[in-house]
Regions:
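Active-site-adjacent "lid/gating" segments in soluble enzymes
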Residues: 1-124, 128, 136
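Aromatic-enriched alpha-helical interface/lid elements that frame and gate functional surfaces
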Residues: 112-190
């Protein structure tokens, strides 16, 4: 187990998950929402260690399985950096389908999968991946049942252009009720 892998310019470099897993893999920059006074996201220290340790455990088990089947041993390795890149593969895949770079300002994020501040100062976030199935119910719950019929928002491309407006509408709705009430409402709609 190394910070950056057994080969390459950083092969002998030391590292902790804050830098090797989070920062160099792109999380701290890509996960920040840019504002005039923003900075790279602060990461949960040790979380990258846990993921990397789990990956190392899986490689050891795979090598043991291979030995039990073939009689041959194997060399296993992983690194904090490689685990960070592997963990970011979902973001990388999504970014490939987006014009330009990944969302960095709040108005570029998906309103249906963003955190919102509630009346009690707590945050609520849902994650809608099946848009046609769940978004209309969310829109109704937020008080915007006709949102998808609005000519500004009636196609995915138009919604992307006007995400900032949708974010403002949603923020006002979420701010009107406490988080636990929103959790009950969203759970009742089978929205994660």
């Amino acid at each position: 187990l190394t910070a950056y892998g057994p080969e390459g310019p950083d092969a002998d470099a030391p590292g902790f998950d804050a830098v090797a897993f989070w920062a160099k893999a792109g999380y701290t920059a890509d996960m920040s929402v840019k504002t005039d006074n923003s900075y790279p996201a602060l990461t949960p220290l040790g979380a990258g260690d846990t993921v990397t340790g789990t990956m190392l455990y899986a490689t050891i088990l795979t090598a043991l399985l291979r030995r039990s089947v073939t009689g041959e041993g194997d060399f296993v390795t992983t690194s904090l950096y490689n685990a960070g890149i592997w963990s970011a593969c979902g973001m990388i895949a999504v970014a490939r389908n987006m014009p330009g770079i990944a969302p960095v300002r709040r108005e570029e994020c998906s309103p249906e999968s963003s955190p919102f501040l509630c009346a009690d100062g707590e945050w609520v976030m849902c994650c809608i991946l099946e848009y046609d199935r769940y978004a209309p119910a969310l829109h109704r719950a937020l008080g915007y049942p006709d949102l998808l019929h609005d000519p500004r928002f009636d196609t995915p491309e138009k919604r992307m252009l006007h995400n900032g407006e949708i974010m403002d509408l949603f923020a006002a709705s979420f701010a009107a009720k406490p988080a636990d009430e929103w959790v009950r409402i969203l759970s009742g709609l089978d929205i994660v």
